[in-house]
Regions:
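Long, intrinsically disordered, low-complexity accessory segments associated with secretion
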Residues: 3-5, 11-467
């Protein structure tokens, strides 16, 4: 049986743990946007058939999640020993005589008898129920002082192995996708996208990194402190980048993005990697006036004064199959919209978040509110009546009928089209309108109104809601 440890001699189930440096090896990470990290380490440590015990450097280890992907190896126990603090060193020094450095370089020696309650024996044989004042000096012994966390792992191998393959789930590293779209007047946009990794726990040196996009349930809170993981998480040798952009694959109900080349990042130092080459996409712009009805609940009477309504600006990027942008699934993230001014400088004109978008599905985002397109809505009529003879099993049946006038003003020199939408859960309908409504779904209808440049347009409609 082979053993290696930095802690000294240990006995466990008849296995001797002999002193040696912790084993290192290749590291790869799968980073999830919620902060979880799957850490995989292939360690240059041979396993003999049967029981093996080793000391490993496993940064951010949650022992409960440790396992071996090798079908011939099982983890039978794992003990995480954090970096040594002063109290732990004092406990390990019980029975030892330590030197305590006091003010102006003075020293005093005392034997540690107990830490809680504190008891020390002085050189004259007297016992003191406290520690001597000053800072204790400890011998630099591996069995006494650990400068970083280490894990003592017991493995059962059904056959000898040349390396040790381990994996576990940690936390403290997140990633987000941010996209930039430079929109032009011709209806075409140039789109780029990148992933930014932020670490509050791991310092990674030359590791293979994958980013995972998808909705993964979380049922368990990691118990060990993230601070214990603030050490190097990888020792793989540097290699030339495989490609300039991430490659993508489907695993279960997630999409996994392999970043090119070995990746290194430090705590608190964000790293950005491109997700795909620059792509061109056609787009359309929409102006949308949201409806007056609540999604659920009572449609109330409004003031007779006109009510200013924000006009939302939406962009839809076409992502047909067979196009460079359409064949690529997009991890959910933030889309930043830019447009060039008269001098050719790009200006930020909108920003929106969106969810994971599969290949072939158009991307629709709301960039903000219009500046030169405005809307006012006024309630011109309102009636509420009780409907006799309600259906069996229902209480009082109320019908609300309300009429509205929406005035659209376009300060742009060119003509535009504005959507006025209404959506509501339940039994409702449009009984009269100055423009034909279009039914988008069982709960939403819209009016499409052309508005001339530097001009106005008016819509009137009546809604009937039964509740």
């Amino acid at each position: 049986m082979k053993t290696a440890t930095g802690f000294g001699l240990l006995m466990a189930v008849g296995c001797l743990l002999t002193a040696a440096a912790p084993a290192h090896g290749q590291t790869s990470l799968s980073i999830y946007s919620d902060g979880r990290v799957v850490v995989r380490k292939i360690i240059a440590q041979k396993l003999e058939r049967g029981r093996n015990m080793f000391s490993f450097d496993l940064p951010g280890l949650d022992p409960a999640t440790l396992f071996s992907p090798d079908s011939n190896v099982a983890v039978t126990s794992a003990v995480l020993r954090p970096a040594t603090d002063m109290e732990s060193a004092l406990r390990a020094s019980i029975g030892r005589t330590l030197t305590f450095v006091q003010g102006k370089g003075d020293t005093i020696q005392a034997t540690v008898l107990s830490v809680n309650p504190p008891q020390t024996r002085l050189a004259n044989g007297m016992v003191m129920f406290s520690l001597p004042g000053g800072t204790p000096l400890f011998p630099a012994e591996a069995a006494l002082i650990r400068s970083k966390p280490e894990a003592v792992v017991t493995l059962e191998a059904s056959r000898a192995r040349d390396v040790t393959d381990l994996a576990y789930v940690s936390q403290g590293v997140t990633w987000e996708a941010v996209y930039q779209a430079v929109i032009g007047g011709s209806g075409s946009a140039m789109v780029t996208g990148a992933a930014t990794i932020n670490s509050s726990a791991f310092k990674v040196d030359s590791a293979a990194v994958q980013l995972v996009a998808g909705s993964i349930n979380r049922s368990r809170v990691q118990l060990n402190a993230v601070e214990e993981a603030r050490v190097s998480a990888g020792m793989a040798a540097p290699a030339a980048p495989r490609d300039a952009f991430a490659s993508e694959q489907v695993v279960g109900e997630t999409h996994v993005y392999d970043l090119p080349g070995p990746i290194s990042f430090d705590i608190g130092s964000p790293l950005t990697a491109a997700l795909f080459p620059r792509a061109h996409a056609d787009y359309t712009q929409e102006f949308v006036v949201p409806g007056v009805m609540p999604w659920r609940g009572y449609l109330s009477q409004m003031s007779a004064d006109p009510n200013a309504v924000p006009v939302q600006v939406w962009y839809t990027f076409k992502r047909a199959h067979g196009t460079a942008f359409g064949d690529r699934p997009l991890p959910g993230g933030t889309m930043q919209l830019f447009q060039r001014d008269s001098s050719g400088r790009v200006q930020l004109v909108g920003e929106a978040s969106f969810t994971h978008t599969p290949a072939g599905k158009d991307l629709r985002v709301e960039s903000g509110d219009a500046f030169d397109v405005t809307a006012e809505r006024v309630q011109t009529d309102y009636h509420q009546t009780n409907i006799p003879n309600p259906p069996p099993g229902r209480g009082g049946h109320t019908r609300v009928t309300a009429s509205y006038k929406v005035t659209l003003t376009n300060a742009k020199p060119n003509a535009i089209t504005v959507d006025v939408r209404e959506s509501h859960w339940g039994d409702w309908k449009i009984t009269d309108s100055s423009a034909p409504p279009e039914k988008l779904s069982s709960s939403e209808q819209r009016f499409r109104l052309p508005v001339p440049g530097n001009g106005t347009a008016t819509l009137t409609y009546t809604i009937q809601v039964d509740s």
